[in-house]
Structure formats: structure tokens, C-alpha cells
Amino acid sequence: EILAFKLDDNEKAITLLNDALTLNLSKLNKAKLKMKLADIYLFKEEVWEATLLYSQVDKSMKEEPIGHEARFKNAQLRYYIGEFDWALSVLNILKSATSKLIANDAMTLSLVISDNLEYDTIALQRLAKADYYIYQKKYELANKMLDSINIYNPNEVSMPYLLMRKAYIADENQDYNLADSLYKRVYQGYADSYMADDALMKDAVLLERFLDKKEEAMECYAKLIDEYTASVYVAQARNAYRRLRD
């Protein structure tokens, strides 16, 4: 993983993983290695190698969390390459997955696709391309693609998700003040959006850890707990709020 995503030595990482797969490993460990291998192939834009490996993990670990994760990543891959109906059919099944985080991620991506598919397919194609650039850590290209939606396909449907992706890039680039302002635009301007609780949680963590604004972070945690009671982040927010309060 370090070789592929940090040191940009994909081929060496692939060789190491393929060598490891020849060892006498448990079914779970083989599945984990195949997942890493698929992630690298996707990073390299070898999407058919990636989808084959994700499908193998899904099939061999169907009822396990790693199987659900592989199915989600395969749906995400299809979204990246513009096969939206295929992705949506898988995501709609995954929304009832045992893992709350997988179910939540599936719900979010499902809504991004379904809302934009109905409203503006060109904006959706651009969002998908930007997301793929983000996966590949090509942040400058991703930002340009997101900005192009604002210029050529401005719409309120895609805006909360677009802002969240720009906030993620700012966060990754350690531009925490920009990330903070973008998260705020989501939960203040689009409070009814399915992204609002996610924006609150991410902003609270950022305010606490990187901007040293503990009081403001507590306000975000409290708002999330009070106003988004069904959020997957409520328990985490409650624990963080108590820790800061005490």
C-alpha cells in the first residue's frame, strides 16, 4: 500500500502482493490481499483487472464484511467509469448491509447517482470523473473538474456533494481553513441534505484537531446529536462531545 499510494511504485507493490498470494494463507487473508491488489489496479486505471478481483472477493466472502466492502468498491468503480445503472443496482442492495459504514457509504453514493441521473447526467459524469481523480490523488485535476460543473452545469442537486469533495481535497492539502468554510457551506446552506451530518462530523473533527477551536467543535457535535438523530455518526459525536466537555 505504501509502495503503491505513497511511493508511486505500483509494479513493485503488485509483484509483492502476487507473491504473497502464492503462500498458504487463510481465506480471509487472501481476500484482503486481493482487495489491495484491486485497489492498485484501479489506481492505475486497469479497471477490468480491478473489477475481476473485487468480484472474486465478493463471491468468496459473500456474507462477510470484506465481501460487502468488495461489492461496494466494485459499484464505486462502475460509477467512476460512468456505468451508473449498474452501480445503482448494487448500491441499492448494499444499503441494507450489516456494516453501518458500508450501508451509509452505499446510501450516499446511491443518492448522488439517482438524484443527478434524473436531473443532469452531464454533471453526474463530471462528478464521477472528479471522484476518480480524487481516488488517484490527482487533486488539481479533480478541483478543475468540480469547478467545471459550477461553470457549465450549475445545479442545487449536486452542490452539497460537490462542496464535500472540494472540502476533502482542501483537507488532504492541509488547507484547513478552506475545508472548514466548505463544510460550513454544506450544513448551513443545505441543512436538509443527506451530506449535512457528514459535513458536521468532519468539520467538528477538523476544528478540534487542526484549528484548535474546541468550543466550536463542541457546537458541531451537539448540533449533530440534536438535529440528526438517525446519523451513523451520533455515537461518535456524543463520545467526542463528552470528552471535550469533561
Question: Which residues are covered by each model-predicted region?
Answer:
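Acidic, polar-rich low-complexity tracts and alpha-helical solenoid repeat scaffolds
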Residues: E1-D246
